[in-house]
């Protein structure tokens, strides 16, 4: 439970932060992808801006979003060169079905031995993370956004590797660019006008890649190979 609360604090603080700095197509010079770094002296510390989850936020909100399964086709993109069917879990904010608005997307990755349930839980037994996000959106402390909980494991099945999944996290970039993003954003209302490479690149300001533990490693790899498709990257732990 303690680990879950820590993850809730990290994820919600990150998403609220991204809401504060709204995802837009502005090109003003003061709105940079990479802000100037701060030199950190030995024994110094910086504030992460993390606060306790407000009382009541872990209980169901009045305006509840939902979590659904999204199936898509992809490839192993390795020596197997095998076509496979995979799935992700998707958080859909309250009001999405009746809205004509476009939505930002957070692509989220679990850690070593995890899966698509690591953040949201099972479809019939969701974690408190969903409730917290519902409350943040309901109280307008966070923009309504779609969240895609994906997995780098082939066939959504945990695999034994001799590199703590590093090779899988690296290879996931091709699956993400070629299959998951186009198929998901073709099915949902996002800022991509179409699933052409040109339009996916043009809408990069409206995507975040977030990962925990080996998901953070996945995030660093995406900074290396997917910068055209994502503006925001959040590796943590």
Predicted regions and their residues:
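Positively charged n-region of N-terminal signal peptides that target proteins for export
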Residues: 1-4
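C-terminal motif of bacterial Sec signal peptides marking the signal peptidase cleavage site
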Residues: 14-17
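Non-catalytic cap/lid and distal C-terminal segments of serine-dependent acyl enzymes
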Residues: 22-237
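Short, linear, compositionally biased motifs with a strong N-terminal bias
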Residues: 10-11
């Amino acid at each position: 439970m303690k680990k879950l609360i820590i993850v809730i604090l990290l994820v919600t603080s990150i998403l609220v932060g991204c809401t504060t700095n709204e995802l837009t197509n502005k090109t003003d010079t003061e709105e940079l992808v990479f802000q100037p770094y701060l030199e950190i002296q030995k024994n110094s510390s910086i504030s992460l801006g993390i606060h306790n989850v407000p009382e009541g936020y872990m209980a169901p909100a009045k305006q509840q979003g939902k979590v659904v399964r999204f199936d898509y086709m992809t490839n192993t993109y390795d020596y197997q060169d095998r076509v496979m069917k995979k799935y992700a879990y998707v958080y859909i904010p309250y009001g999405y079905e009746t809205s004509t608005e476009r939505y930002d997307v957070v692509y989220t990755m679990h850690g070593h031995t995890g899966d698509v349930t690591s953040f949201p839980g099972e479809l019939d037994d969701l974690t408190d993370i969903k409730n917290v996000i519902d409350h943040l959106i309901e109280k307008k402390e966070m923009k309504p956004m779609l969240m895609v909980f994906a997995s780098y494991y082939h066939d959504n099945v945990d695999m034994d590797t001799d590199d703590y999944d590093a090779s899988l996290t690296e290879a996931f970039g091709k699956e993400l660019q070629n299959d998951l993003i186009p198929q998901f954003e073709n099915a949902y209302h996002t800022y991509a006008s179409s699933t052409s490479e040109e339009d996916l690149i043009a809408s990069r300001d409206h995507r975040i890649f977030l990962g925990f533990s080996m998901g953070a490693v996945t995030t660093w790899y995406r900074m290396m190979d997917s910068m055209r498709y994502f503006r925001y990257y959040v590796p943590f732990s």
